[in-house]
Structures are given as C-alpha cells and as structure tokens.
C-alpha cells in the first residue's frame, strides 16, 4: 500500500489537478496534518517542473532537427508567441509568472507556468524559483480555502 503522503505527492504532480486537488484530498480524505498536506503537495507540484523546464527545449530542438514540419511549427510558435506578448510581458514577466502559477484555478499552475516559461524563453535558473514561489503561494491559498479561512 502506498502511503497517503506519497499519494498526495503523486496527485500534486499530475497536470490539471496539481496541489489544488491534492491539498483538500490530503486534509479531508487522508486526514493528514495541515503541515504534511502542504509540504507533500508543494513538493509534488514542484517536482515535474524540473523535467518540464529541462526537457521541453531538448525535445523541441530534437524534433526540429529531425523534421522540417516540426521546425516550421516551433519557429512559428516561438516567433508568434514572443512577438505577440513581448511588450507588456517583458516588463512584468517575473511577476506575471509568479501570479499566473499562484492563482488556484484550472489551467493555471506549475505545469502551464512551465510551458509559458519555455515558450517565452525564460531560462531554467530564472523560471524554476519563480514557479516554485508561485506554487508555494498557491499552496497557502488552497490550504486557507480548504480550512475555511478564506471564503470563495
């Protein structure tokens, strides 16, 4: 049997659910302490970020080298994305990334934040701490909502 802590970690590592689902499950289904629920959810949510940030670029480069179709697609995607959002995003990109990851709604979070960092060319050394900070803030928000300390 897998421990509840490891189950919480795994749930938090999954896309879409992330810690937004892991914390309430850990608190109410597994009856973990607030501290355990928070720590295992945050760590589980941050864990895949490392691989996403490190390997998306390698995969896109590999595919671009192997296929003209992929090269055209990635060139189009990066050029379009960066040109379309360059003005406002460049000035506030660090703040944007933290806020985007910290908003506890579906389609925002560590997975999507990592994808955004990749698309905008934010290097790992900069993106990882920003996304981690956003995950910690999201963890605090979701924990407080789960405990009824913030009403939604």
Regions found by a protein language model. Name each.
Residues 1-8, 29-38, 43-101, 125-126, ...:
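Membrane-interfacial helix-loop-helix
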Residues 108, 138-141:
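Membrane-embedded alpha-helical core segments of multi-pass
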Residues 13-25, 104-115:
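Transmembrane helix boundary and interhelical junction motifs in multipass membrane proteins
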Residues 27, 117-119, 150:
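Helix-capping/transition residues at the boundaries of transmembrane alpha-helices
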Residues 117-137:
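Interfacial loop-to-transmembrane junctions
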């Amino acid at each position: 049997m897998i421990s509840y802590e490891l189950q919480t970690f795994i749930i938090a590592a999954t896309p879409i659910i992330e810690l937004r689902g892991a914390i309430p499950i850990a608190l109410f289904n597994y009856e973990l302490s607030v501290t355990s629920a928070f720590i295992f959810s945050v760590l589980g949510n941050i864990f895949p970020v490392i691989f996403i940030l490190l390997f998306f670029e390698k995969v896109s480069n590999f595919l671009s080298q192997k296929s003209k179709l992929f090269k055209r697609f990635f060139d189009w995607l990066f050029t379009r994305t960066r040109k379309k959002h360059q003005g406002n995003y460049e000035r506030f990109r660090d703040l944007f990334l933290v806020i985007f990851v910290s908003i506890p709604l579906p389609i925002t979070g560590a997975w999507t934040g990592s994808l955004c960092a990749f698309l905008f060319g934010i290097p790992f050394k900069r993106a990882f701490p920003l996304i981690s900070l956003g995950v910690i803030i999201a963890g605090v928000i979701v924990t407080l909502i789960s405990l009824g300390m913030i009403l939604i």
